[in-house]
Structures are given as structure tokens and as C-alpha cells.
Amino acid sequence: MRKNIVAGNWKMNKTLQEGIALAKELNEALANEKPNCDVIICTPFIHLASVTPLVDAAKIGVGAENCADKESGAYTGEVSAAMVASTGAKYVILGHSERRAYYGETVEILKDKVKLALANGLTPIFCIGEVLEEREANKQNEVVAAQLASVFDLSAEDFSKIVLAYEPVWAIGTGKTASPAQAQEIHAFIRSAVAEKYGKEIADNTSILYGGSCKPSNAKELFANPDVDGGLIGGAALKVADFKGIIDAFN
């Protein structure tokens, strides 16, 4: 079912103690609130088992930032989808541009990650988006369509369980932001691609988040677009006042 969502991506930030403190602070900030969106925090693996029981599950969902493309076994340093799920986490970010760029994650690797996440009851937040050169060459639709191949071999039933997140890679951590019109244009293209593959009903029920330097000052304008269903938030998720300011954009 299509929902408004604000999901925080902590990336490689916060020690265990700092992460616990941040989660507690967010939980307290929302204690007397009824957000008009689903709120999710995606944390480094070390935080999951500590943070999940700390927050009010009715208001804050918890997820990981990645999982392995293998079920289990001799893969030193990897963390499986089953391990993530065993902490009580419900979500996992997959296909983030930083993992595609720095760790060589391909369409095939991501297919396996998505399937394992779903098999273990996790909701994938699947990221797609173009770099600056691709945007300047007007190839953003072509790039995004190719990235969607990682999830377009799912059954309609499984696809309906995922959340999509569009990242204009050129806007991540740069302070640049796609204009509301640019965001709406690419989100509408993504929804039309989903409709072409799975039909209008599933497309209309798919949440598509915006993930590029979203902050309290621009969130309301971005979220006002008909095909923008919330945000995948990086830097602003590390400060409760900023993160709550984005959540409040739906109020």
C-alpha cells in the first residue's frame, strides 16, 4: 500500500553509544506526536539489536543500510538478511549509489540481495538514480530504467512489498537539490515504468521516495509533488531537529 515515508540513512556514522542516544532522542521527540508518515531509521549493523527495542515500534521502524547477497556461510565480514531480521529490524536499504560506486554492486548482485531480503520478511528500500554526467547527457530515464531491472524480475506480489527511492546522485551530500519539478518529472517516469511492467494498480500503490539533499527548508515543496511520497534522508537524519522538521513537512 502506498504510504508517505521519511526514512533516515545514518550511513557510517555514530558509535554504538551515540546511536543509542540519537534513537532515544528521536523517540522522545515523537512521543506526543502522530506523524502523518511512516518514520524509519536505517542504521549501521552494530546499532540494530540495541536501537530496535528502544524505539516505539508503532511510530519508528528500524532498518539496515545493506545486507549480503548470500544466505550464510564462509563470507567473512558479511551480514545476511536473516541476521538483520533477527534483530527485529523490518527494513533494508539496497542499491544505494554509494554501494554501487564504491563496492561495485551490479544488477545481478542486487537481484540476489532483494530476493533474500524479501525471503526474510524485510522491506527493501531500493535505490535508483543517475550521476551528474548522465543527467547532463539527458540519460536519467535510461539509467533508472536499467537499474530497475534488479527488481523487475520479481513477481507482482513481491514487487508490491518494496519501496523505491530515487537518488539524484549529483545532489547527495553536495548541497545541490533537484528542483521540485525535476523530482516530480523523474518520479512520474519511475511510476510509469512500474505501471508498464506491473500495471497501474501496483504503480499507484508503490511509494517512491526522494533522496537528494532533502532538508526541512525544502521538504514541504518536494513532498507536495503527486509522485513524491517522502524522502530517504542522509545528513539531516543525524540531527533530530532537522529530521523531525522533515517529518513535520507532512503535517
Curated annotation (Swiss-Prot):
<dbReference type="GO" id="GO:0006096">
    <property type="term" value="P:glycolytic process"/>
</dbReference>
<feature type="binding site">
    <location>
        <begin position="234"/>
        <end position="235"/>
    </location>
    <ligand>
        <name>substrate</name>
    </ligand>
</feature>
<comment type="subunit">
    <text>Homodimer.</text>
</comment>
<feature type="active site" description="Proton acceptor">
    <location>
        <position position="167"/>
    </location>
</feature>
<dbReference type="GO" id="GO:0019563">
    <property type="term" value="P:glycerol catabolic process"/>
</dbReference>
<dbReference type="GO" id="GO:0004807">
    <property type="term" value="F:triose-phosphate isomerase activity"/>
</dbReference>
<feature type="binding site">
    <location>
        <position position="173"/>
    </location>
    <ligand>
        <name>substrate</name>
    </ligand>
</feature>
<dbReference type="GO" id="GO:0046166">
    <property type="term" value="P:glyceraldehyde-3-phosphate biosynthetic process"/>
</dbReference>
<dbReference type="GO" id="GO:0006094">
    <property type="term" value="P:gluconeogenesis"/>
</dbReference>
<comment type="pathway">
    <text>Carbohydrate degradation; glycolysis; D-glyceraldehyde 3-phosphate from glycerone phosphate: step 1/1.</text>
</comment>
<feature type="active site" description="Electrophile">
    <location>
        <position position="96"/>
    </location>
</feature>
<dbReference type="InterPro" id="IPR000652">
    <property type="entry name" value="Triosephosphate_isomerase"/>
</dbReference>
<dbReference type="InterPro" id="IPR013785">
    <property type="entry name" value="Aldolase_TIM"/>
</dbReference>
<keyword id="KW-0413">Isomerase</keyword>
<protein>
    <recommendedName>
        <fullName>Triosephosphate isomerase</fullName>
        <ecNumber>5.3.1.1</ecNumber>
    </recommendedName>
</protein>
<dbReference type="GO" id="GO:0005829">
    <property type="term" value="C:cytosol"/>
</dbReference>
<feature type="binding site">
    <location>
        <position position="213"/>
    </location>
    <ligand>
        <name>substrate</name>
    </ligand>
</feature>
<comment type="similarity">
    <text>Belongs to the triosephosphate isomerase family.</text>
</comment>
<feature type="binding site">
    <location>
        <begin position="9"/>
        <end position="11"/>
    </location>
    <ligand>
        <name>substrate</name>
    </ligand>
</feature>
<comment type="function">
    <text>Involved in the gluconeogenesis. Catalyzes stereospecifically the conversion of dihydroxyacetone phosphate (DHAP) to D-glyceraldehyde-3-phosphate (G3P).</text>
</comment>
<keyword id="KW-0312">Gluconeogenesis</keyword>
<keyword id="KW-0963">Cytoplasm</keyword>
<dbReference type="Pfam" id="PF00121">
    <property type="entry name" value="TIM"/>
</dbReference>
<dbReference type="InterPro" id="IPR035990">
    <property type="entry name" value="TIM_sf"/>
</dbReference>
<keyword id="KW-0324">Glycolysis</keyword>
<dbReference type="InterPro" id="IPR020861">
    <property type="entry name" value="Triosephosphate_isomerase_AS"/>
</dbReference>
<dbReference type="InterPro" id="IPR022896">
    <property type="entry name" value="TrioseP_Isoase_bac/euk"/>
</dbReference>
<comment type="pathway">
    <text>Carbohydrate biosynthesis; gluconeogenesis.</text>
</comment>
